[in-house]
């Protein structure tokens, strides 16, 4: 039939062997903060405080993460998995490949965070199938332009030579989540070419993408000297 020459990619071997051209302009945001007792000794991030509706106050408890009562809109097909489980990482990578997603932007809460434990394995598995990994810098405790610079240095120094480390036009890509929490003029110290702690024209230069919540905030990205 018409699909007679189409290669099926049902298993690991098929994905590894197939001649796949991934779209490295298609990026997913990948959260590697989940844990479970069998791998990590406890549940992580499957539980969550219940958020109150606007205008309400008080303590309405939390979702326990136990007995399938998890903080998730849909129950995951892979169950309450651990982000440190190598088999889970392999399955996630292959889901991305089947969707032709070329880059995973992994959430980053700092060097000592639980999520950092799986970054090396994520990079290794991505490299096997030609996928790439970039980083999504979250509002970690103590985040400032200075500590963001320190984290950029750590990421580039630790992972920058890995074949799966994503670069575009020779530069790594970083997303800065909730960048509006810090004043644009403060960010400019880091991202302006003449800033006090600038990464520009250094080995830590990159493409830095901020976050706005409304159109009126778009000029703040330019003031911060971010790239988008």
Protein language model regions, located:
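Glycan-processing catalytic domains of CAZymes
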Residues: 9-228
